[in-house]
Structure formats: structure tokens, C-alpha cells
């Protein structure tokens, strides 16, 4: 009997069979079976994180409809002036101009002014301080100064130093010189060549009335003066002479 129990225990140990209180047995793990077939596809997963932009694609074909015009650009740099064009044809003749004003008040003022000028001219002529010859008027202020001062005085008054261009003008200047009994400078100056005088504007003399033997300053006397008899003499420009201007 004890031998039978021992044998039973050995078999139980070897086979690893265990029984629980519910009267069923749990055996040791068996050999794995063959894999089963694939199941049905699962549901879509959630959207992943947004990736980086991809490279630009190739340029597409031209569109069918033109785009809207762009805004005006900035003004460019002005170009070089072009060549002068040909003279155009004369325009049509304009209508006749209006007649000169016949306003009585203006005419009265004009005549009064003209009368006063004639009166002033006459008074100065009687005093010997102003003489009109042709289109010229010769006048003096009675002062004796050097040549540069005379030239400045005449310029301030709107005239020039008196310079006769014919015998009639020479006689008029001479009469003023005699009136004041003082020699006067003339509007002449000597050039680079000794004895070669010209007018202050640079034009050559078209009339002369030199005293016999004059000019003979040999380049040292750059100005010209008038004697009481109306003849001329070359003289240095620093002497005091009668101021006579022409207008």
C-alpha cells in the first residue's frame, strides 16, 4: 500500500499535474499554435504635426486673362535737350490794336509836364549852364574837380563826360567853358600808342580840334582838356577842371 502511494506522488510530481478545489486541473503551457490570419484594418489615426514648406514648383503656363495695370512709377531723370527744331511758319495776323488813350486828364498832365521842361531848359540855357545841340544836351554844375570825379558825377546823373563829335557840339562846350572861364576835361582818353586818343567807350575819334602841335605828352598825359578858345590839349588827369556832362 505505501508503495502505491509513493508511486502516485512521483507521477504527480513528474507530470506537474495540480488539482484545485473545484475539481479541475491546470496543466503546464503547451506548444504555441500556428499564427492566425490578419484582422480587419483599424481606424485612421489623428493628423500629425504640420511639416515644413516644400520647394517651389515649376512655373505654370501663362494665364488667359491679363492682370490689372500696376501703379504709375516714379518720374525718370530728364533726358538731354534735343536739337533745336526748324523755325515754324508765321502765325495768323492778329486783330488791330486799340487806339492810343485819349483820356483828357492824361493829355493835360502830359502837356503841363512838357511845358515845364521847356521852361526849365530855357532858364538853364539863359544861365549858360545847359545847352541843347541836336539830340544832345550839355550841362555843368559849375564845379571844378579831377577827371575821375567828373566821370563819376556825370555817371550818377545818367550822362557821360562831354565829348564833341562835330564842330557844332565843340562850339557849344566852348561857350560853357568861356562862361565859367575854366578849362574843362573832355570825354577822351589816350590809348597804348602815345598821341592816339579815343572816346571813353573805346570808339575812335571822328572829330578833333587839337591846338597846333598837340598832343605832345608822349604817353604821360592821358586826358584831354579844352581851352577857352575851344581847342584841345592833352593833359594829366589830376588837375581840377570844369565839370561838363552830356546827355
From Swiss-Prot:
Q: Name one GO molecular function term.
A: carbohydrate binding
4-hydroxyproline modification sites? 29, 32, 35, 41, 53, 56, 62, 66, 69
Binding positions for Ca(2+) per the UniProt entry: 214, 216, 233-234
| One protein family per Pfam | Lectin_C
The UniProt record lists the Collagen-like domain at: 27-99
Q: Which residues form the C-type lectin domain?
A: 131-247
Q: Does the keyword Oxidoreductase apply?
A: no
One GO term of the cellular component aspect?
extracellular space
Instruction: Give the record's subunit note.
Output: Oligomeric complex of 6 set of homotrimers.
Q: Which family does it belong to?
A: Belongs to the SFTPA family.
Supply any other comment. Answer: Pulmonary surfactant consists of 90% lipid and 10% protein. There are 4 surfactant-associated proteins: 2 collagenous, carbohydrate-binding glycoproteins (SP-A and SP-D) and 2 small hydrophobic proteins (SP-B and SP-C).
Chain's role: In presence of calcium ions, it binds to surfactant phospholipids and contributes to lower the surface tension at the air-liquid interface in the alveoli of the mammalian lung and is essential for normal respiration. Enhances the expression of MYO18A/SP-R210 on alveolar macrophages.
Q: What is this protein called?
A: Pulmonary surfactant-associated protein A
Species this chain originates from: Cavia porcellus (Guinea pig)
Amino acid at each position: 500500500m505505501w508503495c502505491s502511494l509513493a508511486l502516485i506522488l512521483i507521477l504527480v510530481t513528474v507530470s506537474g499535474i495540480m488539482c484545485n478545489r473545484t475539481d479541475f486541473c491546470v496543466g503546464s503551457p503547451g506548444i504555441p499554435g500556428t499564427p492566425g490570419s490578419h484582422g480587419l484594418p483599424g481606424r485612421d489615426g489623428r493628423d500629425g504635426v504640420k511639416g515644413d514648406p516644400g520647394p517651389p514648383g515649376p512655373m505654370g503656363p501663362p494665364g488667359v486673362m491679363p492682370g490689372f495695370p500696376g501703379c504709375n512709377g516714379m518720374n525718370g531723370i530728364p533726358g538731354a535737350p534735343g536739337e533745336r527744331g526748324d523755325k515754324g511758319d508765321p502765325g495768323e495776323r492778329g486783330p488791330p490794336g486799340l487806339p492810343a488813350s485819349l483820356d483828357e486828364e492824361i493829355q493835360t498832365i502830359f502837356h503841363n509836364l512838357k511845358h515845364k521842361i521847356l521852361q526849365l531848359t530855357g532858364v538853364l540855357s539863359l544861365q549858360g549852364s545847359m545847352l541843347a545841340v541836336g539830340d544832345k544836351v550839355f550841362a555843368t554844375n559849375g564845379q571844378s574837380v579831377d577827371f575821375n570825379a567828373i566821370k563819376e558825377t556825370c555817371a550818377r546823373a545818367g550822362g557821360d563826360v562831354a565829348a564833341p563829335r562835330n564842330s557844332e557840339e565843340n562850339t557849344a562846350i566852348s561857350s560853357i567853358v568861356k562862361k565859367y572861364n575854366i578849362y574843362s576835361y573832355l570825354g577822351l582818353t589816350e590809348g597804348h600808342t602815345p598821341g592816339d586818343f579815343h572816346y571813353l567807350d573805346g570808339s575812335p575819334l571822328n572829330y578833333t580840334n587839337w591846338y597846333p602841335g598837340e598832343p605832345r605828352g608822349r604817353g604821360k598825359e592821358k586826358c584831354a582838356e579844352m581851352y577857352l578858345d575851344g581847342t584841345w590839349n592833352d593833359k594829366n588827369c589830376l588837375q581840377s577842371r570844369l565839370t561838363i556832362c552830356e546827355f
